[in-house]
A protein has these predicted regions:
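Conserved loop-alpha-helix segment in the C-terminal half of the alpha/beta-hydrolase fold
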Residues: 152-187
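Flexible "cap/lid" loop of the alpha/beta hydrolase fold
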Residues: 48, 52-53, 58-92
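Active-site loop/oxyanion-hole signature of alpha/beta-hydrolase fold enzymes
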Residues: 1-38, 201-204
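Gly/Ala-rich beta-loop-alpha elbow adjacent to hydrolase catalytic centers
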Residues: 39-43, 47
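Conserved catalytic-core motifs of eukaryotic protein kinase domains, centered on the activation segment
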Residues: 5-11, 72-75, 168-169
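Alpha/beta-hydrolase active-site loop signature
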Residues: 1-3, 68, 188-191
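Catalytic histidine-centered segment of alpha/beta-hydrolase-like enzymes
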Residues: 187-200
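Conserved alpha/beta-hydrolase catalytic His-Asp/Glu region
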Residues: 71-78, 91-150
Length: 211
């Protein structure tokens, strides 16, 4: 449902497993046997699980602050209990309802102006169907805590330490995720945008260390 991405009506396309299949289609279309994947926020849980399910095709993976990927049982239960109502609100309210979501880009006022403006242009293209289906089938099922101790490939967490609600999840990640390297930044949730130069350096060094 983001930007020009497709937003099918069929709910089956929004599961983490379905995303993994799409990543494989992209990999094969690129003609590469092994690659690196990087996930931001909600996408982090999707790329992390892909790296677990398709480890033979992943050299390493990177992720940023993700409270959905590292959600505890209480948070997951809350999302599951509220998913239907939240999804229906988006379908009925459209773009106006999407703009009320706490993580909408319009609230990311600390971003550099040119990045903020680009995000807002993209946000105007949000698909209510895509966002509604994401709330139903993606967000409540993205947690990777069950597979984290068995993560088979090197993984880099680029953590924005200004995001207070991620602190507990970061500590959990450091304690439980196998093969984890972590680099911390003086940034918030959007670490790759707020600290782009440092983020690029960290990711480049991580990739170079594995190839």
């Amino acid at each position: 449902g983001h930007g020009n991405s497709p937003a099918p009506e069929d709910l089956q396309y929004y599961s983490p497993a379905a995303y993994g299949l799409q990543f494989e289609i992209i990999r094969k279309a690129l003609g590469v046997e092994k690659w690196f994947v990087c996930g931001y926020s909600l996408g982090a849980g999707l790329t992390f699980r892909y790296a677990y399910d398709y480890a033979d095709h992943v050299i390493g993976h990177i992720f940023t602050n993700s409270n959905s990927a590292l959600a505890d049982e209480a948070q997951i239960l809350d999302w599951k209990n509220t998913a239907s109502k939240s999804s229906e609100n988006i379908r009925l309210g459209g773009i106006a309802a999407i703009e009320k979501i706490p993580v909408h880009p319009r609230r990311a006022r600390t971003l550099p102006t040119h990045i903020y403006d680009a995000l807002m242009q993209d946000a105007a293209k949000f698909s209510p169907v895509g966002v509604a289906n994401t709330l139903l089938a993606t967000n409540p099922n993205t947690c990777i805590r069950d597979i984290a101790p068995h993560n088979p490939r090197p993984v880099l967490l680029c953590a924005g330490d200004k995001e207070r609600r991620f602190k507990t999840n970061k500590l959990w990640a450091l304690e439980h995720i196998a093969n984890l390297e972590c680099v911390s930044f003086d940034a918030g949730h959007g670490v790759n945008m707020e600290a782009s130069e440092g983020f690029n350096i960290a990711v480049t060094q991580f990739i170079q260390s594995l190839v």
